[in-house]
Curated annotation (Swiss-Prot):
It is found in: Cytoplasm. Catalyzes the ADP-dependent phosphorylation of D-glucose to D-glucose 6-phosphate and glucosamine to glucosamine 6-phosphate. This is ADP-dependent glucose/glucosamine kinase. Binds 1 Mg(2+) ion per subunit. Pfam families: ADP_PFK_GK. The gene is glkA. Inhibited by 8-bromoadenosine phosphate (8-Br-AMP). It comes from Pyrococcus horikoshii (strain ATCC 700860 / DSM 12428 / JCM 9974 / NBRC 100139 / OT-3). Keywords: Carbohydrate metabolism, Cytoplasm, Glucose metabolism, Glycolysis, Kinase, Magnesium, Metal-binding, Transferase. Residues 5-457 form the ADPK domain. Gene3D superfamilies: 3.30.1110.20, 3.40.1190.20.
Length: 457
């Protein structure tokens, strides 16, 4: 028998609990990727003119299959079309100076904090008031100006001593790392393509984040930095390639050993990783992490390199992502890697597969969904109390349909059930029909859930 869950009431209670607990977290270490986001809202006429000018046939080639990196203008425009056609996000490194100059001249509508670390530092430190220590590969004046006020710190050496200071107090003069983000709304039309939902394509004009450049303070004094945290969130491994991944992955492994020795729970925030060799290396690293966060494209890409091509196809063939295929993928991932917590987010619903059991897992997911809805609605969250506004956003129909499937299959009760030795947690999310922006929503979801779950436990 299917019972109707009172999700609105659960949302409100979860928010009350997290508001009371979240500031108890004493510190979060965030590494490694921070940059500047230059956001351009795409216009049909402008994009079509650009496509015609460089040659439509050549551009369309790349709308079928993404290149590994961007070396030409047709590759840039074709990759943007790839995202529009599927309503899926993608990010590629722009290696050519000519294409970087083309993007700079194309311009932007707004500049924002970018990179998973930068976005999470502003949210956790600037909005939630939790002390964070952020890795910033290049602290230019513009980069520093994008950090919010609050307990956000970067390590620096002073007379051989390690000090933590706000990024705006840092010595200036380093380079700008700019990622150009091409945003499109749902039903955006270009040529004969129509976007099934809002999303974006990212072209990275950046010589530091893509090679996982790590600052000397973080190489020489990592243990000292880590001791000032209770939790760690690691991100930024996704642009690495078969040619350059050896040294950075080795360093990440060393950092994880220190975190594990100190008993600090580390979460990996996954992002789409085009290089399959690197993707497999990241899967091997998962046994050193407590937790991982990913969406349907990322999950499919992971199970694919684990040898499950047909399962990968099933995960992404439907919209919203097929929950039965997703759970099969999550189960494979948790069993084969030994990670203790997986948080899956997609349009309409979130799932968690965890060794830990309890309502706090669901409450953390609900809080993170409110944070995401608020960010989508407002473009930015300025203070913790803003998240109450997310309560007014309606729950999406897609998620409620998925709930019926999962209740039948796994006997969920108020979103909680079990599968083998794990707790399976489900929530339907609140869906903003016309979001102001989609950038950073995944990072908002994962960091809010990971940190609030820890604070509630």
């Amino acid at each position: 028998m299917i019972t109707m869950t009172n999700w609105e009431s659960l949302y409100e209670k979860a928010l009350d609990k997290v508001e009371a607990s979240i500031r108890k977290v004493r510190g979060v270490l965030l590494a490694y990727n921070t940059n500047i986001d230059a956001i351009k809202y795409l216009k049909r006429e402008d994009l079509e003119k650009r496509i015609e000018k460089v040659g439509k046939e050549e551009v369309l080639r790349y709308s079928e299959e993404l290149p590994k990196e961007i070396e030409t203008i047709p590759q840039l425009l074709g990759s943007i079309l790839w995202s529009i056609k599927r309503g899926k996000a993608a990010e590629l490194l722009v290696v050519s100076r000519e294409v970087r100059e083309y993007m700079r001249k194309w311009g932007w509508d707004e500049l924002r904090m970018g990179g998973q670390v930068g976005i999470m530092a502003n949210l956790l430190g600037g909005v939630y008031g939790i002390p964070v220590i952020a890795h910033v590969p290049q602290l230019s004046e513009l980069q520093a100006s994008l950090f919010l006020d609050g307990p956000i710190y970067v390590p620096t050496f002073e007379r051989g001593e390690l000090r933590l200071i706000h990024p705006r107090e840092f010595r200036k003069g380093e380079e700008d790392c700019i990622h150009y983000i091409y945003e499109f709304p749902r039903n955006f039309k270009v040529l004969d393509f129509e976007a099934p939902r809002e999303n974006r394509f990212i072209g990275a004009a950046d010589d530091y984040n893509p090679i996982l450049y790590v600052r000397e303070e973080w190489i020489e004094r990592f243990e000292e930095i880590a001791k000032r945290s209770e939790l760690a969130i690691i991100s930024g491994l996704h642009p690495l390639t078969q040619e350059n991944h050896g040294k950075p992955i080795k360093l990440v492994r060393e950092h994880l050993k220190i975190l594990n020795d100190l008993g600090i729970r580390a979460h990996l925030e996954f992002a789409f990783t085009p290089d399959e060799v690197v993707r497999l290396e990241i899967v091997k690293l998962l046994k050193h992490f407590y937790s991982v966060g990913l969406n349907e494209v990322e999950l499919a890409s992971v199970v694919s390199v684990m040898g499950e091509k047909e399962l990968a196809e099933r995960i992404i063939s439907k919209d919203p992502a097929d929950p039965i295929a997703v759970i099969e993928g999550l189960l494979k991932l948790i069993k084969e890697t030994g990670v203790k917590r997986i948080h899956f987010h997609t349009y309409g619903y979130y799932l968690a597969l965890t060794r830990e059991k309890g309502e706090h897992v669901r409450d953390a997911l609900l809080f993170s969904a409110l944070a995401a809805a608020t960010k989508a609605m407002k473009g930015n969250i300025e203070k913790l109390s803003d998240i109450r506004e997310g309560l007014a956003v309606p729950i999406g129909e897609q998620g409620l349909e998925v709930e019926k499937i999962l209740e039948k299959e796994f006997s969920l009760r108020d979103g909680i059930g079990s599968i083998e030795d794990y707790q399976l947690t489900f929530i339907p999310t609140k869906v903003v029909k016309k979001p102001k922006s989609t950038v950073g929503i995944g990072d908002t979801i994962s960091s809010s859930a990971f940190v609030s779950e820890f604070s509630l436990h």
